[in-house]
Amino acid sequence: MLSVLLRDYAARHPIEVLSRLEPPEALPQGVTWQTLTAVEMEAAWSAARVEKQVDEALSRRVPLPGGGSLIIDEREALTTIDVNSGSTVTAADGETLAVEENLRAAAEAARQIRLRNLSGILLIDFIDMHSDMDRARVIAAMEEAAADDRVKTVIHGFTSLGLLEMTRKRTRDTLCDTLTQPCDACHGTGRVRRD
């Protein structure tokens, strides 16, 4: 599993691995490895704010620049991403503000999809846009962001209800499935972090 992750990510960006373990015999190109003591590892973990970043990656709400947010709901049949504006978009230039917010949201949604390893059917409920040209800009932004994804991703376009429909091939478990487990206290309707 580790070798696959290193290979996939090192192909796009150089990676430095900090670990208490000795490196595998063969490291993919672009990977450097540094073996640390337990104390050094804890300090590096704390300095990189790893726990905070993991909590953010598992959070349902993702803040956007400008005050908006994404709300990500993973379900058995599909995953939905709802784009919320930071303020009510009702001014005369409301359509322009909506498109700008949607373009920011498209970039962050694509990043979250990769980060969380979301797959299957994905529906994104962008802020309402009335212009076909504006919808085309948002589709182009999603296609550009998806082009960086090694996993096969297809943008199908907007549905008649105005939802952006896309699919992404499942290659392994989602981040949520990997790092959390069903909550026994609520009979499996919620999830808690694994130990």
Where are these regions (language model features)?
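OB-fold/S1-family RNA-binding modules
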Residues: M1-E76, T178-D195
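Conserved glycine-centered short motifs in functionally critical loops
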Residues: G66-D195
